Each structure stands twice: as structure tokens, then as C-alpha cells.
Amino acid sequence: MSFSVHNQKGSKRPLPLEPLLFLQVPRSNYLHFQEEKQRLHLKKFLLDRMFLVAKIQANVERKDVADYYEQMFQSVLKHHLGEAVTGLLLIYPTSILHILESSSDTLYKVLLDYIGHVKDETVFFIQQMKIIVISHNIPMRLFMQWHVSVIKVPVMYLDDVTQSQSLKEVITDFLTQTHKLSLYLCQTMKVGTKGPGDNLHQVAPDLLLPEQIIKYLCKSEEFMDPATFINMYNRPIHITLDSEVVWPAPSRF
């Protein structure tokens, strides 16, 4: 398409090109604006994803477990700058599986809070917590909010694979199933919904991890508890020995 512009003789007025250029700029709708705003908000800090397992007392109210985490998340974000926590908490009869997504500093504070309760209380209702894996600098969240689901599947319907598989096979099944479940929930749940609720074993029974695997990982010595991880986290990478103190000071690369 071409445009012909006729100037009057002797006229020095600039051509009205601004309206033409303005029409060529794509306009974004309000939804696109909100999505871009959310994307920029989530990029304030580098995001990490952490997988935790732990045992809980059989007589503890499932609501108490969920309330503990909700109140703790609010307290951490109130006193420390960081990203909001999103993820999934599966509460089994005697154990929990927790997937958390947030900034590293926020996840660090979550572990410290658990350590504080274990030290200060005679018997804390969450016990034998183990860190299975931490993924650093993840490109995006799988969960846009934090969800809780109580699993009420009878043990008799779940096969105990821990008796016939090696630790490598068990952890492979654990990571595979949890990632499949996370992707499924990411694709099916919309922002603002309450989440899967307590019927997850009916909605996605094939993606549900047997409780025996969680309890098996809680007892495994190959995985760190929060206290051991925090001690390693705070330990300096390079330790200077007395024999290394020379002048000029050596440089490390």
C-alpha cells in the first residue's frame, strides 16, 4: 500500500505522519497487561523449587499441619523480603510430601523455622524431615498459589515397591511421579481456584505417590535433614589454613 501526499506550494507544515505510525503499533488488552505484570513480578528474585518429605504424628489434625505452614509463610514474608511461596502440600495419614517454590532466602527461612520448632518443643508434630532435591534458578513456577490436599487412600490399595527396588529406583519413581502430578495440576488448575481438594486420589489416582515411598525416604540416610543442610549452607567454601597465610596473598580462581 502506498500513500500519496500533496503539498501546497510554499507550505512548510510537517506531514501528519504520527497518526499513521500510531496505527501500526499493536495494542495489548488488559489480560496481556496483567500477565506481563505477573511475569515481571515473578522475576524479582531467582526462583528455587524444593521437595520435602516428613513424618507426622498419627493423631495430629490435618488442619493443624496446613495452618502451621500458612502462618509460617505469612510470618516469613512479613519480616523478610522475598518471593511468595507457591506449591503443593500432600498430607497422608502419617507423612507429608511438600513441593515449595520461592526465592532461596525464603526457603532458607522455612527450613530455619522447622529447625527452631524441633529444638524448642519436646515433640513437634512434624518429624524426620528430609530434603530430597532443590532445583535452583527454575525458569518458571508450576504453581501460581499454594495448595493443600489430604490423601485418604487406604494402605491396602497401594503396593509397597520399596521392598523390591533399590534407592536409585525409588527416588527415580518419586521424582517422575511428583513432576507428572505437578504438571497435571499446573495444566488443570486455574489461578484463584481452591485446588484439588481432598479427592486427589479420585481425580488422578495414577499420579498419586504411595505413602510407603515417602516413609522410606524419611528413613534414608542418603538425604539431608534441614539442620545438616543449613550447616553446610553456612559453611565457607574456601577455608584458609595457617600454613597458607603468606604475602602476597594467593589468588583463587
Curated annotation (Swiss-Prot):
A Pfam family recorded for this sequence: TEX47
Tissue specificity as recorded in UniProt: Testis-specific.
Source superkingdom: Eukaryota
Protein name: Testis-expressed protein 47
Gene name of the encoded protein: TEX47
